[in-house]
């Protein structure tokens, strides 16, 4: 059975029969929109003759035509109508364009309201500036084809689809006066992240937060396909959004004059409804979940384009998605059609002889920071305030002797985060997918509970930690949480995202996009102020997935991070709780980075006092004298072997192996090196944290065997250190996809990061140990067998493993 689209009911839009726009207002708004559409076409097509003062010629056309027309008219249409209400009600509004490929529809208004020329003075508001504005678009040495960081007013590029709505809600949190207009493309609405982001309305508090106004831009088509939501019945579409908890308003049509009136009436209705919801909540002091309004805007794809080209439908069809007419430079008939199309906007009525927007239209835009493109929220670093951080040392673990006391590594961090939240109750939040308690961060609940505006039941009082004004954000969607965090950071605040290590891969692409945004912002957009770093804590790590097994074992997120620019990425693997505190304090103070911290939540041995941890983490890499017996490298006592580690569980196993070696071979000189800052392994020519060759060689020598026990996939160490002098002698152990429901030691044995295999590795690479080493090697093999058999029989490791302490 086929469900056909149906017409909207008359009750869907309560129109003002007198029409909200006067004849003059309608003319002016439409004229402003015509100017936006003219600029959009100019960006796609023109490299000369910007005002069409001459007949259009092939030489005026760019040699390579790039860009997307289809969404641009709808995006600028919304922008123009928002401007009207910003001026009327003095609104604080930012605009997120989900279909960011329709950037011409956003760039045009930013240029017309003057912001673009303010941040890029060479793109002046005259004919010369307009030409530069046109030519730079999707052009080498210019700007990209999306709402990139170079776009004033943008916090969302919209290149990869799916994140506009979560970014919008993130920006609205703790911004009570802000309205975030999130325009969602109907193609984007088919993505998983966007589909779940509709539920964000269960987490917005009308007292302390701003509002999000979702506008579904239903133009019917993607690149070459219809969209699902455009091909279901009106009733089904309406029920969908009612089911999500919204009140949907429909604005539909083709005729610009009619749709202008509908949009003006509807947008004013929903803005007043938002204000009413907020006023009632703030007056009563009671935060309830209202039915927030949203708009479904159904207009043609490529609106105002020619109806057809060569008998093929253009306006209102997928052919208008990108460059609508591709051969204008070589086809005279098509060139004429383009010229007629551009002239249909009557640029001579919109711009004066110098190429400036005429004053009557200029007055339609807001002024100063009320301009969408100049709103400081969209340049969040301007508004960013430093976190008020307590002394993390107050939460330190007492370590009087290395490797003697056990602590859950992330629990002291939870105490530190609790103190941070207490001191920053309007600009700091924690984001995690139902894992705050699991990752041992539940101390934060002493200060603030989980945000929750859906129903709360009586039994929730028994440990559920739910509150309408909580600051801990939990939802079982890594996509949505990460989007919230990014929106929160980009609008000037601070946050931490934590996740089970294996499932950080769910947001691989989101991390990619944010890293790219930071790279451009830092290096190419001087007017963007630094924002707080994106801090990611990966816990419940590969080596201690006691309840879950193989599916939860994947340390590869950090491999992905190393593919991104050294300017914006940092990776830390603290070996114990005090190092984790030091690293977290550093990361939370930083700006314009993605900081990834890998730290397990289970009980582990503690190695460094807080002062030792600070010194070690400040260096990022170093020799642990207390674990070494190479007499500080003094001649002729250079080490026979270097035992290196990076990560918490593998550090303990490397230390246990070192203890065995020192017991079995008292004359063997072992140097123990621990790495916290993974990028120390790269040369300083490749990463600003990298060691110089001299420093690296002084630690790892130029010719001695190095046994490197690594938390993640072993080839990552080779990737980072391949240019080092001693690389051929670096032997790396790490996770090799050998896992199940294992005991901790059994999992280590399966992947050869255990103490016994490490001892064998040393024996195999230090010839001076002689024939006596053969017997030790055999005992190590026997230990591997015995410990595996014990685990299979008893389900736990042997007592001497569970109770092992550093013996020296």
From Swiss-Prot:
Gene3D superfamilies: 3.40.50.920, 3.40.50.970
Molecular function per GO: aldehyde-lyase activity
Keyword field: Lyase, Thiamine pyrophosphate
GO BP: carbohydrate metabolic process
UniProt family annotation: Belongs to the XFP family.
Name of this protein: Probable phosphoketolase 1
EC number from the UniProt entry: 4.1.2.-
PANTHER family attached to this UniProt entry: PHOSPHOKETOLASE-RELATED (PTHR31273:SF0)
Enzyme class: lyase
Listed cofactors: thiamine diphosphate
